[in-house]
Structure formats: C-alpha cells, structure tokens
C-alpha cells in the first residue's frame, strides 16, 4: 500500500491537464472519532462515545505542510524529533501515511496544544472540540521553542542597570541615556529545519513577489509553502510545492487538493514556510 505522500507524488507525475485534482479528499475539515466504549465507560462522567472536531482549518493547513516537510528531507524527522518528540513524529507520519486524518488532528490537539487554546463541551453523547480562532495561536505558537532566537545588547553607559542584556524572541527597550548596540539575532538551538514567517494581510497574488529563498544564520532557506486566509469565510487553506509543482489544499472543499497553474485568487497570505536547503 502506498503512503499518502507517494500517492500525491504519483498523481502529479501522471497528471493530465483535464484533471488537476487528487483522487480523494485529504485531511478533510472537521472530523469524527468514534470511541469503542467498554464496560468501564458506563461509570465515566460525563459519558461520551464520540469526539467531534469543528473549525479545524486553524491547524489543517500546517499539518499538511508539516507532513510535506517531513517527507522532503530524510534528516528532518530525526531533527524535528529533538523538538517535537520521537514518538510524536513517528506517530504523526504513520497516521498521515495511512489516511487516519481525524486521529492525527487529535494527536496534535492533545500532544501539542494547551487546554486553553481550544473550546470543548459535551453535547449529548459527543465531546465537541472547537478550534475556531487563529492558526498562529493554534499551531505556530506551539513551535516557538523550535524557532526561538536570542539577541545580545550592550549599552555604552557603564552605569546602565542592564548594560549587558540577553533577550529571546523580541527586541528590548530600556530607558537609559546610553547608546545600545545589538548583536545579530541567532537561533537558540541552531538553524531549524524550517521557519514560519507571519505574513497576515498580504494578498495571495503577492506570492509572485515574496523571496524564494532567505539567508538566515549562514543557511539558505527555500520557499516550501504558504497558508492562506479567506476573509469572507474566516477560513484557512494552504499551498505547497512537491517536485516543483504547486498544489492548493483546502479541507473545506469536496475536491480539496489540486494542482495550481496560478496563485489562488481573493485570498490573503497568512504565513510563509521556508525549509532549510540541503548542504552539498
């Protein structure tokens, strides 16, 4: 049996102009997970026998991008295991490979998200988990450790209370009359396999104007994908490339994975995703 990634690559290779879509839905919006309740479940309070997921587009696009990234470089699964955990990476790849889409979403929710990042309630016999919100809050926030940076600064005033300062994530402001010199910001844990840039409010047509590569910490990063936002529907989708071909993924559509011949129209850019180039 071919994995999902192998099936997608095969569909690109065998593509005909009249059929630019993948043959089956991939990572559909939402999801229902049925619990096989045993005798002990009768005593549970509250009792529910299924889990229903709503508004999962805030994680769907990035889950699809993460799957593509992990398959693009044989070393990336090992590297990401250091940050996400070996068991998580292995389980994530297995579930995606075998089309277990609802389960892979639950894996991310329960393993990587905090309880306050989503709403949940029991309705009749269902536990409903609602991920409505912002993909930066529901996904990229949980990757901060992977992409964290640090910067040192030095003040010319010897009496400055914080003459030498280390700061993670952001530039600091200190009320002091001296001149503060900042070092180059560097990654805390070395160059990560990928970086995510917040590009909210850019139009998808602007994809033609974004840099296709970045130089960060003596490494080159290549544009691998983007997440897109439909303001009218308050809905996220994603675009990514495999073997030089761009594809658009939208879990809300019946035909949700298609080859692109131009950027999707009437959508805003939400994020750009760059992967570290392989050293030769």
UniProtKB/Swiss-Prot annotation:
InterPro entries: C14orf28-like. It comes from Bos taurus. The gene is DORIP1. Interacts with DRD1, the dopamine D1 receptor. Coiled coil: none annotated. Could be a regulator of the dopamine receptor signaling pathway. PANTHER family: HYPOTHETICAL LOC314168 (PTHR35350:SF1). This is Dopamine receptor-interacting protein 1.
């Amino acid at each position: 049996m071919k994995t999902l990634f192998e099936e997608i690559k095969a569909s690109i290779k065998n593509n005909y102009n009249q059929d630019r879509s993948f043959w089956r839905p991939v990572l559909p919006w939402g999801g229902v997970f049925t619990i096989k309740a045993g005798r002990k479940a009768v005593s549970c309070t509250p009792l529910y026998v299924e889990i229903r997921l709503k508004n999962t587009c805030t994680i769907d696009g990035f889950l699809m991008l993460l799957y593509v990234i992990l398959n693009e470089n044989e070393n990336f699964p090992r590297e990401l295991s250091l940050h996400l955990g070996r068991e998580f990476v292995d389980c994530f790849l297995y579930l995606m490979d075998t089309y277990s889409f609802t389960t892979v979403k639950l894996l991310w929710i329960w393993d990587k998200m905090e309880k306050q990042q989503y709403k949940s309630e029991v309705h009749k016999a269902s536990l409903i988990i609602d991920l409505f919100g912002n993909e930066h809050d529901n996904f990229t926030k949980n990757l901060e450790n992977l992409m964290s940076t640090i910067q040192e600064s030095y003040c010319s005033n010897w009496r400055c209370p914080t003459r030498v300062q280390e700061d993670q994530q952001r530039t600091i402001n200190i009320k002091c009359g001296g001149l503060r010199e900042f070092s180059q910001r560097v990654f805390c844990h070395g160059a990560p396999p990928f970086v995510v840039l917040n590009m909210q409010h850019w139009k998808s047509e602007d994809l033609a104007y974004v840099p296709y590569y970045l130089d960060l910490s003596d490494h080159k990063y290549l544009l691998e994908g983007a997440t897109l936002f439909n303001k009218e529907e308050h809905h996220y989708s994603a675009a990514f490339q495999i073997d030089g071909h761009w594809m658009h993924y939208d879990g809300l559509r019946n035909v949700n994975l298609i080859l692109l011949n131009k950027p999707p129209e009437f959508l805003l850019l939400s994020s750009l995703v760059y992967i570290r180039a392989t050293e030769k």
